Amino acid sequence: GPFNLKTWELNNKIVVEKNPNYWDASMVKLNQIHYYPVSNVMTEDRMFRAGQLHVTSTLPSQKCPIYIEENNPDLRIDPYMGTYFYRLNTNNPVLEDVRVRKALAYSIDRRLLVEKVTKCGQIPAYSFTPPGSNGYQPDTSIPFDPKLAKELLNEAGYSEENSFPKLEILFNTNEDHRKVALAIQQMWQQNLGISVELVNQDWKVYLSREM
Protein backbone atom coordinates (compact mmCIF):
# COMPACT_ATOMS: atom_id res chain seq x y z
CA GLY A 1 0.00 0.00 0.00
CA PRO A 2 0.96 3.68 -0.06
CA PHE A 3 2.12 3.62 3.58
CA ASN A 4 4.19 1.36 5.81
CA LEU A 5 3.77 0.90 9.54
CA LYS A 6 6.54 2.78 11.38
CA THR A 7 5.54 2.61 15.06
CA TRP A 8 2.62 1.31 17.10
CA GLU A 9 2.31 2.45 20.71
CA LEU A 10 -0.58 0.48 22.16
CA ASN A 11 -3.48 2.73 23.23
CA ASN A 12 -1.40 5.80 22.38
CA LYS A 13 -0.49 6.30 18.72
CA ILE A 14 0.06 4.56 15.38
CA VAL A 15 2.46 6.13 12.88
CA VAL A 16 2.64 5.13 9.22
CA GLU A 17 5.11 6.57 6.71
CA LYS A 18 5.20 6.90 2.95
CA ASN A 19 6.15 3.71 1.12
CA PRO A 20 8.82 4.55 -1.50
CA ASN A 21 8.18 1.22 -3.23
CA TYR A 22 4.49 1.87 -3.78
CA TRP A 23 3.63 1.67 -7.49
CA ASP A 24 2.18 5.21 -7.51
CA ALA A 25 4.45 6.73 -4.84
CA SER A 26 4.82 10.03 -6.72
CA MET A 27 1.13 10.73 -6.14
CA VAL A 28 1.34 10.19 -2.38
CA LYS A 29 1.67 13.70 -0.93
CA LEU A 30 1.91 12.86 2.78
CA ASN A 31 5.15 11.68 4.38
CA GLN A 32 3.50 10.40 7.56
CA ILE A 33 0.09 9.90 9.16
CA HIS A 34 -0.43 9.72 12.92
CA TYR A 35 -3.50 7.89 14.23
CA TYR A 36 -4.70 8.56 17.78
CA PRO A 37 -7.20 6.25 19.52
CA VAL A 38 -9.78 8.43 21.28
CA SER A 39 -12.64 6.61 22.98
CA ASN A 40 -14.67 9.70 23.94
CA VAL A 41 -16.35 11.52 21.04
CA MET A 42 -16.50 14.83 22.92
CA THR A 43 -12.75 14.66 23.58
CA GLU A 44 -12.12 13.88 19.92
CA ASP A 45 -14.27 16.84 18.85
CA ARG A 46 -12.35 19.19 21.17
CA MET A 47 -9.02 17.88 19.85
CA PHE A 48 -10.17 18.53 16.27
CA ARG A 49 -11.36 22.06 17.02
CA ALA A 50 -8.10 22.77 18.87
CA GLY A 51 -6.05 21.73 15.83
CA GLN A 52 -4.65 18.60 17.47
CA LEU A 53 -6.33 16.44 14.81
CA HIS A 54 -6.56 17.24 11.11
CA VAL A 55 -9.27 14.70 10.25
CA THR A 56 -11.90 12.93 12.32
CA SER A 57 -14.76 10.72 11.24
CA THR A 58 -16.39 10.79 14.68
CA LEU A 59 -18.72 13.63 15.59
CA PRO A 60 -20.95 14.03 18.67
CA SER A 61 -24.53 13.64 17.44
CA GLN A 62 -25.65 16.78 19.27
CA LYS A 63 -23.01 18.86 17.46
CA CYS A 64 -23.89 17.71 13.94
CA PRO A 65 -27.12 19.76 13.48
CA ILE A 66 -25.28 22.84 14.80
CA TYR A 67 -22.49 22.43 12.25
CA ILE A 68 -25.04 21.83 9.49
CA GLU A 69 -26.98 24.99 10.41
CA GLU A 70 -23.77 27.02 10.54
CA ASN A 71 -22.75 25.58 7.16
CA ASN A 72 -19.40 24.81 8.77
CA PRO A 73 -16.81 24.18 6.01
CA ASP A 74 -15.06 21.61 8.22
CA LEU A 75 -18.11 19.34 8.08
CA ARG A 76 -18.41 16.99 5.13
CA ILE A 77 -21.31 14.54 4.86
CA ASP A 78 -20.95 11.91 2.15
CA PRO A 79 -23.21 8.96 1.29
CA TYR A 80 -22.36 5.88 3.31
CA MET A 81 -23.21 2.35 2.18
CA GLY A 82 -24.25 0.88 5.48
CA THR A 83 -27.19 -0.08 7.68
CA TYR A 84 -27.34 0.18 11.48
CA PHE A 85 -28.98 -2.95 12.83
CA TYR A 86 -29.40 -5.18 15.87
CA ARG A 87 -28.91 -8.93 15.87
CA LEU A 88 -31.34 -11.00 17.92
CA ASN A 89 -30.22 -14.18 19.65
CA THR A 90 -32.58 -16.78 18.20
CA ASN A 91 -31.04 -19.43 20.47
CA ASN A 92 -33.16 -17.74 23.11
CA PRO A 93 -36.56 -19.55 23.04
CA VAL A 94 -38.41 -16.24 23.43
CA LEU A 95 -36.70 -14.63 20.42
CA GLU A 96 -36.99 -17.80 18.35
CA ASP A 97 -40.64 -16.88 17.66
CA VAL A 98 -40.79 -14.82 14.45
CA ARG A 99 -43.87 -12.97 15.75
CA VAL A 100 -41.82 -11.65 18.65
CA ARG A 101 -39.00 -10.52 16.35
CA LYS A 102 -41.50 -8.78 14.06
CA ALA A 103 -43.15 -7.11 17.04
CA LEU A 104 -39.80 -5.71 18.16
CA ALA A 105 -39.10 -4.42 14.65
CA TYR A 106 -42.54 -2.84 14.13
CA SER A 107 -42.28 -0.99 17.45
CA ILE A 108 -39.13 0.96 16.48
CA ASP A 109 -39.73 4.45 15.08
CA ARG A 110 -36.78 4.76 12.70
CA ARG A 111 -37.68 8.26 11.56
CA LEU A 112 -37.69 9.47 15.15
CA LEU A 113 -34.26 7.85 15.62
CA VAL A 114 -32.65 9.74 12.73
CA GLU A 115 -34.39 13.05 13.50
CA LYS A 116 -34.00 13.15 17.28
CA VAL A 117 -31.14 10.78 18.15
CA THR A 118 -28.50 10.44 15.40
CA LYS A 119 -29.33 13.82 13.77
CA CYS A 120 -26.61 13.87 11.11
CA GLY A 121 -28.35 13.24 7.78
CA GLN A 122 -29.09 9.54 8.25
CA ILE A 123 -32.05 8.00 6.40
CA PRO A 124 -34.51 5.55 7.99
CA ALA A 125 -33.84 2.00 6.78
CA TYR A 126 -36.81 -0.35 6.46
CA SER A 127 -34.88 -3.27 5.02
CA PHE A 128 -31.35 -4.62 5.39
CA THR A 129 -30.34 -3.18 1.99
CA PRO A 130 -29.30 0.46 2.58
CA PRO A 131 -31.77 3.08 1.28
CA GLY A 132 -30.94 4.54 -2.13
CA SER A 133 -28.64 1.73 -3.25
CA ASN A 134 -28.75 0.71 -6.89
CA GLY A 135 -30.35 -2.50 -8.00
CA TYR A 136 -33.15 -4.42 -6.38
CA GLN A 137 -35.21 -2.69 -3.71
CA PRO A 138 -37.72 -4.90 -1.88
CA ASP A 139 -41.38 -3.86 -1.94
CA THR A 140 -41.95 -5.06 1.61
CA SER A 141 -40.74 -3.10 4.57
CA ILE A 142 -41.24 -2.90 8.31
CA PRO A 143 -42.76 0.53 9.06
CA PHE A 144 -43.41 1.88 12.52
CA ASP A 145 -46.68 0.22 13.54
CA PRO A 146 -47.00 -0.15 17.33
CA LYS A 147 -50.60 -1.42 17.05
CA LEU A 148 -49.54 -4.32 14.82
CA ALA A 149 -46.51 -4.92 17.06
CA LYS A 150 -48.76 -5.30 20.09
CA GLU A 151 -51.07 -7.69 18.20
CA LEU A 152 -48.11 -9.86 17.16
CA LEU A 153 -46.85 -10.01 20.73
CA ASN A 154 -50.32 -11.05 21.91
CA GLU A 155 -50.45 -13.74 19.19
CA ALA A 156 -47.15 -15.07 20.52
CA GLY A 157 -48.86 -15.58 23.88
CA TYR A 158 -47.78 -12.53 25.86
CA SER A 159 -50.23 -10.37 27.77
CA GLU A 160 -50.70 -8.70 31.15
CA GLU A 161 -51.29 -12.15 32.62
CA ASN A 162 -48.23 -13.61 30.88
CA SER A 163 -45.71 -10.79 30.81
CA PHE A 164 -42.77 -10.71 28.42
CA PRO A 165 -39.39 -11.50 30.05
CA LYS A 166 -36.74 -8.82 30.38
CA LEU A 167 -34.51 -8.29 27.33
CA GLU A 168 -30.88 -7.19 27.27
CA ILE A 169 -29.32 -4.87 24.69
CA LEU A 170 -25.56 -5.28 24.46
CA PHE A 171 -23.58 -2.42 22.92
CA ASN A 172 -19.92 -1.47 22.80
CA THR A 173 -18.53 1.66 24.44
CA ASN A 174 -19.67 4.58 22.30
CA GLU A 175 -21.91 7.50 23.20
CA ASP A 176 -23.93 7.28 19.98
CA HIS A 177 -24.51 3.54 20.44
CA ARG A 178 -25.70 4.30 23.97
CA LYS A 179 -28.17 6.91 22.74
CA VAL A 180 -29.63 4.57 20.12
CA ALA A 181 -29.91 1.76 22.66
CA LEU A 182 -31.58 4.09 25.16
CA ALA A 183 -34.12 5.24 22.54
CA ILE A 184 -34.98 1.67 21.55
CA GLN A 185 -35.23 0.69 25.21
CA GLN A 186 -37.85 3.42 25.66
CA MET A 187 -39.74 2.45 22.49
CA TRP A 188 -40.00 -1.21 23.47
CA GLN A 189 -41.11 -0.20 26.96
CA GLN A 190 -43.71 2.33 25.77
CA ASN A 191 -45.07 0.38 22.79
CA LEU A 192 -44.84 -3.19 24.06
CA GLY A 193 -44.43 -2.94 27.81
CA ILE A 194 -41.12 -4.81 27.59
CA SER A 195 -38.47 -4.16 30.21
CA VAL A 196 -35.00 -3.78 28.68
CA GLU A 197 -31.61 -3.73 30.39
CA LEU A 198 -28.75 -1.87 28.68
CA VAL A 199 -25.33 -3.52 28.94
CA ASN A 200 -22.26 -1.53 27.91
CA GLN A 201 -18.99 -3.40 27.26
CA ASP A 202 -15.67 -2.37 25.76
CA TRP A 203 -14.97 -3.73 22.29
CA LYS A 204 -13.03 -6.87 23.26
CA VAL A 205 -15.55 -7.95 25.88
CA TYR A 206 -18.39 -7.07 23.52
CA LEU A 207 -16.99 -9.38 20.85
CA SER A 208 -16.42 -12.21 23.33
CA ARG A 209 -20.03 -11.91 24.52
CA GLU A 210 -21.26 -12.23 20.92
CA MET A 211 -19.34 -15.43 20.20
Residue ranges and their predicted role:
Residues 1-5, 26, 31, 62-63, ...:
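Surface-exposed, Gly/Pro/Thr- and Asp/Glu-enriched linker/hinge segments
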Residues 11, 28-30, 70, 81-83, ...:
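Extracytoplasmic
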Residues 43-45, 53, 64, 100, ...:
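Short, hydrophobic alpha-helical packing/hinge segments within bilobed ligand-binding/sensory domains
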Residues 54-55, 187-211:
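Periplasmic binding protein-like
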Residues 65-77:
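Ligand-binding "clamshell"
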